[in-house]
């Protein structure tokens, strides 16, 4: 079964989630989201396109808006020092047909599961982190304990078909897939080279296209 989830990254002026975790992002015309995205691509290149990815489902609160979301993420960034966390993205629905309704998604990209688990354990004991969650609970609440985890790989990196968007925005589509009977992870990985070759033999220049699995 295939489920389609269309989302739009909320970055730049709205600046919902897009963040370089070790840096603060100013919300003005000098926004550096594009630089942060370039740093993310550099990190992926250093890992051969591999990442440990986690997705948290989030619910918008009664005070959710661009200004409050920006304040929330700016405050969060000041609490994060983990070098193993090299990519953070946020998604909001871009179509009424979104398979997940009005759910927001917060994506974390780590170097490894072990490093991610260690940082989550530290976060659970972080009093400042708990205070932050309480302060902004009317803006947005995310299900950290119920996060979905994946071993991810980017066969085609985001800068392959054009420079990254300086604003930090990008449009994404997600397909939720199940193994057919008798198939496994090895079969899924064996599928990737053929699909990647098909993309490379097509005209995607200037689109900024990339994909992850």
Task: Set out the residue ranges of the language-model regions.
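C-terminal motif of bacterial Sec signal peptides marking the signal peptidase cleavage site
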Residues: 17-20
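Bacterial N-terminal signal peptides that target proteins for export
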Residues: 2-9
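Short S/T/G/P-rich N-terminal loop/turn motif that feeds into the first structured element of a domain
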Residues: 22-105, 109-213
